């Protein structure tokens, strides 16, 4: 099959990976209930909104800073969005269930326009968002200076989509926490996002069965100490397309991308690297590390800057 045709097919799959679901059940469902949150509103905190919201709700949060305002979301259909500007969620020592600023354990949930920062918990595994159940879309959010940016449970039915977001300076510093850590879930899609300056951990780590990493910037930056820029420790199917991936001269690990180093656990284990720019400033840096046993490894039309080959 011609190389150009393979690339078109891969890009088409990347755009269409998530199955289309009916937004609401058949019949005549009630209109969503809109709950407005803010210091001048009847519902003043997100914690209060989480308790009163039903299974079909839109939460609109007034712009501003919300300190120690943590919540658990269990609704089946939920939209959380900032209104009138950014909403800054500062942990300030608080956490929901000892896990995160937000624990999301519901159905179809979307989050847009929030800045998550400062999460610290006794287990040293705190997150801006702990995602434990359902299908979650995160759009136009930032995750800065948490122990993990987003951390998921290990559930084979979870689906996580991230769009146009930023992850930086997350990590406990022990190499066990990361900017983004997707566990053994069904699907991960990340597009248009910026990952940088993980504290010893990875910029992006995923154990998902299927991964679409498309049109992102994963660069550790000046003074960065991240380990891998991109790791799939258990393989799976990974489409890595159109990204800029680069490491720092102060990195903790000379490898940019790693695949299958903890053993292959999924029925299919395939890596596709198309149209990326890979930057390695180190004399002994390694662009790609793949453990033996992968079903397929394909690399086309990547730009390599610095030392190293594919």
Functional labels for PLM-detected ranges:
Residues 17-48, 52, 65:
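Right-handed parallel beta-helix/beta-solenoid
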Residues 1-4:
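Positively charged n-region of N-terminal signal peptides that target proteins for export
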Residues 71, 88-103, 116-310:
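Glycine- and acidic/polar-rich repeat regions and solenoidal domains
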Residues 7-16:
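Bacterial N-terminal signal peptides
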Residues 54, 74-78, 306:
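Extended beta-solenoid/beta-helix repeat architectures
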Residues 34-36, 40-44, 58-63, 69, ...:
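Right-handed parallel beta-helix/beta-spiral solenoid domain characteristic of secreted/periplasmic
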């Amino acid at each position: 099959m011609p190389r150009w045709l393979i690339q078109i097919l891969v890009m088409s799959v990347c755009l269409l990976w998530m199955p289309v679901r009916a937004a609401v059940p058949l019949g005549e469902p009630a209109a969503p209930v809109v709950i407005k949150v803010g210091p001048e509103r009847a519902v003043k905190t997100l914690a209060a909104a989480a308790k009163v919201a039903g299974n079909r709700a839109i939460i609109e949060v007034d712009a501003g800073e919300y300190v120690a305002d943590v919540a658990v979301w269990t609704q089946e259909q939920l939209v959380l969005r900032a209104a009138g500007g950014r909403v800054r969620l500062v942990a300030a020592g608080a956490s929901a269930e000892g896990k995160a600023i937000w624990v999301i354990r519901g159905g179809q949930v979307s989050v847009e326009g929030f800045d998550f920062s400062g999460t610290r918990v006794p287990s040293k595994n705190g997150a801006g968002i702990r995602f434990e159940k359902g299908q979650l879309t995160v759009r136009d959010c930032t995750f800065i200076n948490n122990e993990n940016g987003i951390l998921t449970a290990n559930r084979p039915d979870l689906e996580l989509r991230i769009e146009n977001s930023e992850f930086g300076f997350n990590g406990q510093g022990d190499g066990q926490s990361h900017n983004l850590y997707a566990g053994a879930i069904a699907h991960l899609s990340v597009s248009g996002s910026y990952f940088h300056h993980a504290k010893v951990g990875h910029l992006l780590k995923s154990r998902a069965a299927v991964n679409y990493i498309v049109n992102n910037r994963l660069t550790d930056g000046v003074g960065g100490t991240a380990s891998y820029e991109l790791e799939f420790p258990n393989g799976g199917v990974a489409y890595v397309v159109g990204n800029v991936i680069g490491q720092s001269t102060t990195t903790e690990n000379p490898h940019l991308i790693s695949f299958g180093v903890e053993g292959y656990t999924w029925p299919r284990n395939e890596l596709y690297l198309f149209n990326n720019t890979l930057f390695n400033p180190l004399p002994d840096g390694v662009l790609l590390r793949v453990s033996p046993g992968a079903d397929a490894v394909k690399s086309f039309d990547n730009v390599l800057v610095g030392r190293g080959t594919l």
